[in-house]
């Protein structure tokens, strides 16, 4: 599993959803965007969907449904109900590698999509947010304040990579 700041296994965590513990101070960190992508070679060989309703006819890459650990990762159903992956992994990096190798079309954070081609650009854009949680007991310490400032500065500097697409 994951390390938990509420159990003091770590002092700080970046998560996909806000933690719900009174022991934590939770703050929004940064928004980020996800979109459908495919390898250029995959599109050249198989074409690209023109509409969301075309997606079931294509090889979809996504998460192993039973291993999705956060509701924010259930985005295939947001795009089209009952859309299921033919290739699946619990790792977003493995999904990116499958897509880059021509395994199909999949949803990726835009910051992981370098070298890939966006699919359905006018129809699919998902917006999410990263959250920063710190244990209440150490939230005000100098080292955690410095770490939070540094992480927030990194996110500000990377804002265009995290959310590069117009709404």
Language-model features, listed with the residues they occupy:
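C-terminal regulatory
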Residues: 4-7, 19-130, 157-167
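Short amphipathic alpha-helical coupling segments at ligand-binding clamshell hinges
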Residues: 139-153, 158-159
């Amino acid at each position: 599993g994951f390390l938990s700041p509420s159990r003091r296994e770590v002092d700080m965590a970046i998560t996909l959803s806000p933690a719900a513990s009174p022991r934590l101070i939770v703050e929004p960190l940064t928004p980020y965007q996800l979109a459908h992508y495919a390898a250029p070679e995959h599109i050249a060989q198989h074409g690209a969907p023109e509409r969301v309703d075309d997606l079931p006819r294509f090889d979809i890459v996504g998460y192993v449904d039973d291993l999705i650990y956060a509701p924010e990762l259930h985005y295939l159903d947001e795009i089209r109900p009952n859309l299921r992956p033919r290739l699946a992994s619990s790792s977003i990096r493995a999904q990116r590698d499958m897509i880059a190798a021509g395994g199909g079309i999949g949803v990726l954070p835009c910051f992981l999509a370098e070298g890939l081609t966006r699919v359905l650009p006018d129809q699919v854009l998902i917006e999410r947010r990263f959250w920063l949680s710190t244990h209440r007991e150490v939230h005000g310490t100098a080292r955690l304040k410095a770490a939070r400032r540094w992480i927030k500065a990194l996110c500000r500097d990377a804002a265009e990579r995290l959310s590069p697409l117009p709404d």
